Amino acid sequence: MNWITNYVRPKINSMLGRREVPENLWIKCPETGEMVFHRDLEENKWVIPQSGFHMKMPAKARLKDLFDGGIYEAFPQPKVAQDPLKFRDSKKYSDRLRDSRTKTELEDTIVAGLGQVQGIKLVAVAHEFNFIGGSLGIAAGEAIVKAFERAIAEKCPLVMFPASGGARMQEGILSLMQLPRTTVAVNMLKEAGLPYIVVLTNPTTGGVTASYAMLGDVHLAEPGAEIGFAGKRVIEQTLREKLPEGFQTSEYLMEHGMVDMVVKRHDIPETLARVLNILMKKPAKAIKRDTATELAPLPVAASA
């Protein structure tokens, strides 16, 4: 009976055994609990079809979706010092970098490129949140500065898509130094007379909010994005007060004058083109008019 127990039974078990299902095959909506097949979610620009909830979008996918035909020149990642402080908390920083690179297939959190959006040449920069929370470190800071320099050289606008928890703590003061560096880069672009547009995504917090994320000429934001410096829980524990409903969301910030427009992800390319045409003083015929959203004429008051 050995041949049955040693060969036949394991063979049958392997044939009838449970097949392994790949991870993240189905994505759950954090708002409604709706389950969405990952390919359907990707085709819908990482927006839940029924609820309209905007999931975090991979940086490469964001640039591909933004540029005309998905075609753009990807900028190389600048070479910088790796783990200069030899930092370690519960895990070595070098190990965190290695794991994030394996997970995202990126060298660091910034993805940048040059292309066209509805015929307008521009440089776009996006954070990859899955790379150590999209945190700002030496490599990210250098990539952002290089992107601004390229925009100035090309004499074209720059569009920023921040998605970050803030400065990268594993790099200490070297990370904090990227705040003034990126701020100087923003000023250089503005001195060159070129537009700088920021599209705030979920989440935009910490040192990124305290620097280049809030220095745009125009600030757009995706629906429901968390935008702020310190987290809501930290503020409540410090002030010992309950914060208003919707505090630090893009809609709340627009109501209080911190954001110019809340724009759905599907409408971002067209909205950017319209805004840039205005900022770059293009002829009126170059601006696509949306008659469905035009304001109705004001009523004329009746004469006394």
UniProtKB/Swiss-Prot annotation:
Pathway: Lipid metabolism; malonyl-CoA biosynthesis; malonyl-CoA from acetyl-CoA: step 1/1. The keyword Repeat does not apply. The keyword ATP-binding applies. One of its GO terms (biological process) is fatty acid biosynthetic process. InterPro entries: AcCoA_carboxyl_beta (IPR034733), Acetyl_CoA_COase_Trfase_b_su (IPR000438), ClpP/crotonase-like_dom_sf (IPR029045), COA_CT_N (IPR011762). Residues 25-294 form the CoA carboxyltransferase N-terminal domain. Belongs to the AccD/PCCB family. Component of the acetyl coenzyme A carboxylase (ACC) complex. Biotin carboxylase (BC) catalyzes the carboxylation of biotin on its carrier protein (BCCP) and then the CO(2) group is transferred by the transcarboxylase to acetyl-CoA to form malonyl-CoA. Acetyl-CoA carboxylase is a heterohexamer composed of biotin carboxyl carrier protein (AccB), biotin carboxylase (AccC) and two subunits each of ACCase subunit alpha (AccA) and ACCase subunit beta (AccD). HAMAP family: AcetylCoA_CT_beta. This is Acetyl-coenzyme A carboxylase carboxyl transferase subunit beta. The gene is accD.
